[in-house]
Amino acid sequence: MSDGELVIEKGMRFDALLEQKCRDRAFGKKDRTRFLIMACVARQILDEPAKSPSIEAILDETGLSRGTFYNNFADMEAAMETVLSTFFQALWTNRPRTAPSRAGSADYDPVYEANLWYCESYETNAGLFAAFTRVAAYMPTLLRMRETMNANWVDRVISSTAKKRGRNFSEAERLTFQGELRLMVAMSIEALRERFIHCDELLSKSFPNAQAMAAGLTKIWNETIRRHL
């Protein structure tokens, strides 16, 4: 199964994307069955993130046999790990491309666009992020994957900033900048968790939607970036 085929469009729940793929004849029967199971797992997580998905509910919904489930996944934990890792992989590596006219406009801010994409995805798929927080302690591969993606994002910001200022960072400057950006990543993750999972009252009033949340985070990100220009 190729995860590279998965692109999460604006406002799309991940289970809906997986359902599209399970009906896509471009994939073989085995892959479509796997997508079907994953869609059911994702839907259960999204609808009830505090609960572990149920194999029985999947079998009832799909009409598949227990043997078919176990032919695809060793157990429910493996199915959850696959769903979450596929979601984050699609979220970070297969973002819809920005239109060239938009990217070239004077008011285009790539940091805001990245934050907006992440905030909108978080708002729509909050249950998957909540489940990640719950299971990451015993699924270290998920944690390492997110750390790698965060590190890649930090490196892209540093490279972009170096181009704007016209010279590379020294080793000491780069280390300081990396540390500050990783703090920004951690702050953003926690802020989004409080806003969209725990529905913090003050954050909800101050940032009523994903667009407002992205603007608020971007302001802090850009203040940090400007100090290194």
Located regions from the model:
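Membrane-embedded alpha-helical bundles of multi-pass transporters/translocases
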Residues: 66, 70-71, 84, 88-92, ...
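Amphipathic alpha-helical packing segments from all-alpha helical-bundle domains
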Residues: 93-95, 120-124, 130-133, 140-167, ...
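Short hydrophobic clusters on alpha-helical segments that form packing/core surfaces
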Residues: 33, 37-45, 87, 91, ...
